[in-house]
Amino acid sequence: MVLVMTIMQPDITKIPAQYRDVLTRNARRVVALQLTGVPEKKGAADAAEPTGSRVGGLAFVTDDYPEPRDSDGNRMIFLAQLNLAKLPPLEGYPTEGLLQFFIADDDLLGLEYNKLAGGSGSFVVRLIPASELGRGRLAE
């Protein structure tokens, strides 16, 4: 699977006038993600790119950004990656590189109630710089 990203622009004309000003002042740009099927077979004309946005499957890795391990040294589950250069720009977010999400492969899928503040080794969110994208591969 890969992701198609679009900017959502809600129609506020149907919202009562007394609320429109508050909604307009507090509006933030967001990106809507829509899953679309794409073959991952090598050589397929419409095959997914290793650095493309995806949910599940194989993660893109490099020598400097190998597959992450949990606090016990076990491989983590790859959830998703977003190619930021192909996203519409959002204020305060990087515009290039590969944003990846991983969780621990355990009974609670990385959730540790006593360590919710982070730093537990049960999940990883990382940004692979654009300069690394030309020298990587899909994890095996």
Feature-to-residue mapping (PLM):
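Hydrophobic, ordered structural segments
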Residues: 86-140
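An N-terminus-focused feature that recognizes amino-terminal "leader" regions
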Residues: 5-98
